[in-house]
Amino acid sequence: MTTEEMLRLRETRLAPYIQLATNLIGKTRAGGGNMFRHQLDTMAILVDYGYIDSVLLKASIVHDILEDIPEFNHNLLISVDFEGHQVYELVREVTRSPDEVKSEFLTRIYEHGSQNARILKVADRISNMITLGFVNEMEFVSRYTDETERYVFPIAELVNGYMLFELQTLVESRRRYVQDFEKIKSKEIYLDSTNFI
């Protein structure tokens, strides 16, 4: 990161958005932790990849707030600061509507999403894929990795080759995880069937 970028990042006021995101502390995740931590993980991924756009970072901190807290007053988000309305619009763009199936949502981001929406969605998916290593429902893990390959890889191709590579590596890793889990499970079944006490 250049000195100029570090100075720009230093001037970005994130605390009010972090404060709003604390509303997600009670929302748990299948892989452990809570949705609040996921917001911060997503922001950290963006910074790690050199994204320091203030609207993008602010939106990443609250990107699940509209979806996970349906009763959330969006005016609180709009009125946070001078960029609040832009942040709200980006959060809306990456929020799946209740009548939208996941494949349609991801296709919409791919075909019509702004560059920031695409970047945010890829960072969000990287965070989700990392925590997927702590999920024990193998059918879900398989379905999610397939969905990532089919719908999110193309989005990543549009925004950042390094992020795409990380997603590809995570998908490979999670598929090995499922295979290893299935091997262990089949050995346990075999051992149980041979145990004649």
Where are these regions (language model features)?
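Active-site helical microenvironments for divalent-metal-assisted chemistry
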Residues: 1-197
